[in-house]
Amino acid sequence: MSEENKENGFNHVKTFTKIIFIFSVLVFNDNEYKITDAAVNLFIQI
């Protein structure tokens, strides 16, 4: 694998991770604000 392909794969994983965090925020938004805050903080850091 070239370096460019590795970087593209890594960016794809980061995008997928962001989607998971967004989904988590939506799921836990109603009753678990602490989990939501943690997910948002991690989302911002990525």
Curated annotation (Swiss-Prot):
Induction: In exponential phase (at protein level). It comes from the Bacteria. GO terms for biological process: cellular response to cell envelope stress. This is Uncharacterized protein YqcG. It comes from Escherichia coli (strain K12).
